[in-house]
């Protein structure tokens, strides 16, 4: 099968760090056929500088009218996602959209309904499902090394005492740290544990740099109630803009062990430094950041447990190419669905909305199905 003719909408960091490198790394699967670049001229174009043969459009309607384009990758600010995704679907294009998907649950639901009615793929770029640290924690939980998990704490922290001034810092729908990083951490949580019963959150401007209504710090707790054969579970997802030094990534506690991991997945920094996803060292974590495990054997006297065995766990190599391979498989097989299911995207939207309500009201918000 010929490579899927792909158009990329957007010329910012996300397009050139999180999308173009993987399209380039998979030439048998995708062709970078077109780009939407509003300020391009006949002599100056960011997309053409990276891909000399790319067809550059300055008008979106003209790009969407190109019948050769099969897949549209949307790498634009979230406040325009609803409009642009709608246009692409109505033009008969399959769509891969950056996260955060839309500012509201209602808009997200409308778009998935539209894609279904037109028998088109619509998926959201939750690439951090393929972070090495997450894959390592996921495997550790699923193989039972920790027993039953009762607390799962996940962080992505930064030390940034200023606002960068991009879409994430402007008081528009879909802005702020919860939509930016929280959408990833919540997606990872529901991938592991499903739908929580309720949400308790605190969102704030930690740095007190205007606009103060755009949060730069959050702590969101997803509550899972005890059920028959299952203990209660709290999933805590956090991010801070004032965190200096080696940052904690995961603390996971279970009935048979604990998992502690420092350091963030290296892929973003590697891509920023110009490393190709084809490089043998791509996605490989530093041994200094390997997780520490404390585990107990399966059959113990709970009244007199032995001292836990401490060990170091090598990080599974992360690889965002896997998401693009899923996209290719979905289009080739005509299933039009990746592992990021529509109901999961909608659940993330619902949890984010509940987190804002919880923080504003200082109460827990039940999460109805």
Curated annotation (Swiss-Prot):
One of its GO terms (cellular component) is nucleus. It holds the Pfam family GFO_IDH_MocA_C. Keywords: Oxidoreductase. GO terms for biological process: NADH regeneration; negative regulation of transcription by RNA polymerase II. Its EC number is 1.-.-.-. InterPro entries: Gfo/Idh/MocA-like_OxRdtase_C (IPR004104), Gfo/Idh/MocA-like_OxRdtase_N (IPR000683), Gfo/Idh/MocA_oxidoreduct (IPR051317), NAD(P)-bd_dom_sf (IPR036291). One of its GO terms (molecular function) is nucleotide binding. Belongs to the Gfo/Idh/MocA family. This is Uncharacterized oxidoreductase C26H5.09c. It comes from Schizosaccharomyces pombe (strain 972 / ATCC 24843) (Fission yeast).
